[in-house]
Amino acid sequence: KLEYRGYDSAGIAVYDGNKIQMQKAMGRLKVLEEMTQNGATLPGTVGIGHTRWATHGAPSDLNAHPHFNKDHSIVVVHNGIIENYLKLKKKLMSKGYEFLSETDTEVIAHMLDYYYNGDPLATITKVMHRMEGSYALGILFRDHPDEVYAVRKDSPLIVGTSKSGNLIASDVPAVLKYTRDVYFLENEEIVKLTRDGLHFYNIDEEELQKEPTHIEWDMNAAEKGGYEHFMLKEMHEQPKAVKDTLTPRIKNGDVGIEELGMTDEEIRAISKIFIVACGSAYHTGVTAKYIFEKLARIPVEVDLASEFRYRDPILPENTLVVIVSQSGETADTLAALRLAKEKGVRTLGIVNVVGSSIAREADNVMYTWAGPEIAVATTKAYSTQLI
């Protein structure tokens, strides 16, 4: 029921009474269903699953969730972005940990392993204190076979409860088939799900009392988060998308743009900027032209990619060509990028899809963290591109 959000891979981990079994695959959910015979090859009553929209690491089987520690005794799924994951990863590697994927999520699994003392709750809070960013986590510990732990910080997470079982999800539609009674986790809250009940805690490991909310939505409305249309929903998601795009780039009040991959001297040497895009992304460029020329006093030319690629543009030395695309796969825009690279000028991609062609081929890339956009008319993708 969360497929409408868009995803590039999926995976599942199930405890079968002896060990945690796992299967994951790139592509549509149907691929995973076929691999597991619609779940028949992964028997069990305790498990976690995930559909992934790539943020760290391109879509692949290895980068798909769940992720695990070295002996598969701790398994994690994760929505969100761990901003300091590279720092944490370096520390873990210095301790002898090896990584199979490019994701920030695998760092979480190894962090849990590093601090694990037999007490899941204490270990989780210790790791929470060391992670920066947004996350919703689902966690299995092999030595606590009848428990699932879930954690929320700046990323949605709900808990559904019924006589037949308890569930976690990032959005209400996923649980409505089983229950309409849900708990909404607040920031830095943890929940332990067991066969018999739910236990809620704060980051100080103090147990909390929470009341469920009864959901009145029908399934169709729920998939749109209570909005009549996806576009309306995405309009209201713009503040979060803008925040998610800005936050990782602001440190102690300063804007960090290390993603440009340029020194201060190289930035000052830029003599002209071309912004190349199609559709709504082109209009982002038109707006950006006014801002760049007013604040940076650098001449900016905005081109439709379909025109740029065919008109043999004059690209002086010290030109920066900025390529803007939500998908990172727009054919004319990709061709324009390749033309700019052939002419030997520096290129910067601004895209929303990690691992896309433009992201791979541009000299440097800046990601917009808008998440998948379902409506045809753009809203949050435009806003984050402009930011």
Kindly label every feature range from the protein language model.
Residues 1-224, 228, 240-271:
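Conserved short alpha-helical segments that host acidic/polar catalytic motifs at enzyme active sites
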Residues 39, 61, 67, 83, ...:
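Functionally constrained cores in energy, signaling, and assembly domains
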Residues 232, 236-237:
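Predominantly extracellular/luminal regions of secreted and cell-surface proteins
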Residues 238-239, 295:
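Acidic-histidine catalytic/liganding microenvironments
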Residues 268-387:
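Glycine-rich phosphate-binding loops that contact phosphosugars or nucleotide phosphates
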